[in-house]
Amino acid sequence: MFKLENKKYFIGIYALILSLFSLYFTYRANFSNPEFEVLMFCILLIAGILSIVYYTKNNEKLHKVALVLIIIFGIISLFLTPIYDVSDETEHFVRSEIVSTGELSTNYVPIPNTTANGYKTIASVTTFFDNAGANVFNTHADDDKIDHTPSYFNSAFAQNPFYGYLAQGIGVFLAKCLDLNAIWMLWLGRFFNLLLYAGIIAVAIKKAPVFKFPLLIVSILPIAIYQAASTSCDGLFSALAILAFSYFLYFYKTPKIAWTDLGIFYIAVILCGLLKTPYLALSLLIFLVPNTNFSDKKQNIIAKLCILVALGIGIAWSSYATTQLANSWRGEYFIQKNVSASGQIDYLLANPLIALQRFGEIYSTALPTVIDRFFYFSNSVREYSSTLLAGLYFVFFCLFSVFYCNSEDLNLKTRVKGFLIFVLIYSGVMAVQYLTCLQLGEKMLQAAYSVVISCLS
C-alpha cells in the first residue's frame, strides 16, 4: 500500500506543483484581472490539503478516499465548467431533460413550422445552447427561472440506452420540483451524475482485493472527474468498466466465486458495452480467471458461455442504435461526408494495403492522441488542453506501472493475456470510430476514452 509517511512533505510538494502550473497558465492566458484565478488557487490548495490529510488517516480504506476525492474535486469542476462545455454536453443535457419527464425512449418528431425533425424538450434547455461556453459571470441566462415552453433540438443521443441518463434526469427533475433557476437543472444533473460515478468507483475499489491504489489513481484523473461532473454518460461508462475490472481481480484472487458476483460482473460488462460496444470484450477477462476458482465445472462453463449472451445482447442493441444514430444531425452529416460503415468495410477489403496502413495508424497516429487526451477538455468548439501536462501524466503512469509493487501481483501469463484483451478493446474502439465517424478512405486521426484504456494498461 502506498503511504504518505510525512504529510507535510507531500502538502509542500502539492502546493509547489499547483503554484508552478498556476503561474504557467496565468502567463499563457495573460489574465488582466486574475482575482478569480487567485480565488480558485486558494480553493484548490485547501481542497488538496484536506485530501492529503484525509488520505493519511484512511489509507487502508481507499474506497472512502476515492469517494471523498471524487466528490470534492467533482463539485469544483461541475460549478466551474462553463455551460455545455463538455464534449457533446448539449445533446446529453437534452436527453437528461427528456428522461426527467419519465420518457425513457426518445421520439424523433416533426418540428412545428419547419420541414425538419427533432426531439421535444423545454425552452430553458435550448436557451443554454445560445450561451454555450459562458459561465454564470458573463451571462444572465442562469438567472432566469425554468421555462417549460416546448422547444426542439436536432439531437438527443437517442442511440444511447436510457440508464445512462437516469442520474442526470433525477437532478433535472429535482430542480424543476424545487422551482430553482434554470442553471440548477444543469448543475444538479451534473451533481447526481457525479454521485453515481463516485458511488460505483467506491464499490469497485472496495471489492478489488489487489490494485486498489492504481484503480484510485485512474478514477481521479482530471479527465475522469471532468466527465463524471457533467451530464455526459461517459462517466458512467468509465465507472462500469472499472467495476467490471475490479470484479475480475476479485475472481482472480477468491478461492470460490459466488453466482451473485458473477452476475454483477456480467451486468457491469453489458451495461458498459451497450454504452460503448467494444467494451463488451471486457467479458473475455473471465478466461483469465483460474479454473480452480470457480465453485464447480458447471459454473465454469456457464461463466464462459455468458460471453456469447453478452455479445448477442450487444449486437442486438447495436442494430437498434445504428438506426437511431441517423435520427440526428449526424444523419445529414453522414450523407454529406459519405460516412458509411458498410462502404468503409468494402473499401478496405478492396484495398488490403490501405487496410494494413489504417491498422498501423491506430498505433502510430491515434495512440499519441490518446496520450494527449489525458489532459484534454473539449466540446469540439472550445478546447482547453496542455501537451505538457498530458506528457507528465503519461510519464507518471509509466513510472507508476513499473515501480508500483504489490505482493499479490498477477503472474506474467495473466498479464500477457490481459494485454491482448487491452489490444483487442483498443483496436475495437478505434475501428468503431473509423467505420462510423470518418468518410471513405480518411486517415485514422480520432481517439477517445483514455480513462478506461489507462485502467486496462
Per-range role (PLM):
Residues 2-75, 303-311, 414-419:
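Start-transfer (signal-anchor) and selected internal transmembrane alpha helices
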Residues 7-11, 180-183, 201-222:
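Transmembrane-helix signature of polytopic, membrane-embedded enzymes
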Residues 34, 230-237:
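Short acidic/glycine- and proline-prone juxtamembrane loop motifs at membrane-interface regions
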Residues 49, 203, 236-254, 267:
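Specific aromatic-rich, kink-prone transmembrane helix
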Residues 101-188:
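Interfacial juxtamembrane loops and adjacent helix segments
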Residues 226, 261-277, 282-288:
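Membrane-interface alpha helices of multi-pass inner-membrane proteins
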